[in-house]
């Protein structure tokens, strides 16, 4: 018997069975019976119909097992394709695997099982960016050291003099720094090029000619001597600006000198530029200069030495010795305000009252809170 005839016979038998059940239900319902018996009969009939429907579905699945499995696999693939919609990228590769039935045995039917496992391999991103055309790379400037006759001999003689003044504990760290640090001139092919460069036609309006000359002196001059705890260097050239004559017997500086301070005092360089921009003109010229024999080559602030200022110690320059109480008294008395001479018993100094306001402005801008605590 062919499968088609078997299917038609099963469908006709199920329809005749349904008709028989319906007729018996109508006959039983038409008879007169108590309400309780009718309710029990109704529940039993519904249960019988439900059992018949379930049995027919099981019979259909057993006669065509491949069709039911195919539908289930198609449903799984449809759900997977919906989830992966929109995630496929250009160049992605998809790999499929065929799944076996739950029993573990492979079906002998000629129908091929549909894949239900999907593997996605995304393309890796490029680690290096593509070369962009049209970019312009800045050219590196080459600096040529100018050698002059007699410089080597002068350098060797000054190196021996300076080496004897440096403590023995620092000889090891400064062995390669003196030859570079003595000659501060830099240039190319016999021409001197200053480290202070102005690329416009004129200097900034807040700098005077004396300021620019002092800055070039501090950045380009050769280091000649190192004295006491202050690191000073003297100029062997013609003085660029007129400086007050140092007091006799001071022994600190003869001529034009500079003070090399710690790298932590770099705020003094910023204070000099801020002083000139604001038009106060109360700070000494200072620059930042790299010296290999100081703090492992870190840039240090170099300040112009003014011999007219009285050094309170060997580390800083200040005009008077001042404490917090004296400072408060001078502010209260308003010494030299509007050109009025103060009384002798007030203890005023030569500093005008307006100068304290400028110092307070500097302390606020530079965030200096320990000026009077030193």
UniProtKB/Swiss-Prot annotation:
Residues linked to a glycan: 281, 314
Topological type in the membrane: Single-pass type II membrane protein
Coiled-coil intervals, chain numbering: none
Entry keyword annotation includes Lyase: no
Matching InterPro entries: FAM198
Sequence intervals crossing the membrane: 39-61
Segments on the Extracellular side according to the record's topology features: 62-374
Keyword entries, A-Z: Glycoprotein, Golgi apparatus, Membrane, Signal-anchor, Transmembrane, Transmembrane helix
Superkingdom classification of source: Eukaryota
Composition bias type Basic residues, residue spans: 136-146
UniProt-annotated location(s): Golgi apparatus membrane
Annotated spans, Disordered: 136-177
GO CC term, one of those recorded: Golgi membrane
Cytoplasmic topological intervals: 1-38
Comp. bias intervals (Polar residues): 166-177
Assigned protein family: Belongs to the GASK family.
Protein name: Golgi-associated kinase 1B
């Amino acid at each position: 018997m062919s499968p088609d005839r078997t299917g038609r016979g099963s469908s006709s038998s199920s329809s005749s069975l349904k008709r028989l059940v319906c007729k018996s239900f109508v006959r039983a319902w038409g008879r007169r019976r108590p309400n309780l018996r009718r309710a029990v009969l109704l529940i039993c009939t519904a249960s019988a119909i439900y059992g018949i429907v379930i049995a027919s579905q099981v019979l259909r699945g057993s006669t065509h097992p491949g069709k039911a499995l195919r539908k289930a696999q198609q449903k799984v693939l449809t759900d997977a394709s919906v989830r992966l919609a929109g995630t496929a990228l250009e160049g992605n590769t998809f790999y499929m695997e065929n799944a076996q039935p739950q029993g573990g045995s492979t079906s002998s039917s000629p129908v091929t099982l549909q894949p239900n496992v999907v593997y996605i391999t995304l393309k890796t991103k490029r680690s290096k960016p593509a070369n962009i055309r049209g970019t312009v790379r800045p050219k590196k400037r080459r600096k040529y050291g100018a050698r002059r006759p007699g410089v080597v001999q002068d350098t060797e003689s000054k190196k021996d003099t300076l080496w004897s003044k440096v403590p023995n504990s620092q000889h090891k760290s400064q062995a390669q720094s003196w030859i570079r640090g003595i000659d501060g001139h830099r240039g190319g092919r016999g021409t001197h090029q200053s480290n202070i460069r102005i690329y416009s036609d004129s200097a900034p309006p807040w700098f005077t000619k004396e300021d620019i000359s002092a800055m070039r002196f501090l950045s380009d001059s050769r280091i000649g001597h190192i004295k006491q705890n202050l690191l000073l260097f003297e100029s062997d050239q013609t003085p660029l600006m007129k400086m007050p004559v140092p007091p006799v017997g001071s022994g600190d500086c003869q001529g034009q000198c500079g003070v090399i301070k710690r790298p932590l005092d770099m705020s003094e360089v910023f204070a000099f530029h801020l002083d000139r921009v604001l038009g106060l003109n109360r700070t000494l010229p200072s620059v930042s200069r790299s010296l290999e024999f100081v703090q492992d080559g870190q840039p240090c602030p170099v300040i112009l030495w003014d011999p007219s200022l009285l050094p309170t110690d060997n580390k800083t320059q200040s005009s008077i010795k001042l404490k917090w109480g004296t400072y408060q008294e001078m502010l209260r008395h308003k010494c030299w305000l509007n050109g009025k001479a103060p009384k002798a018993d007030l203890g005023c100094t030569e500093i005008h009252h307006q100068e304290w306001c400028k110092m307070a402005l500097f302390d606020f801008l530079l965030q200096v809170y320990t000026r009077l605590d030193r």
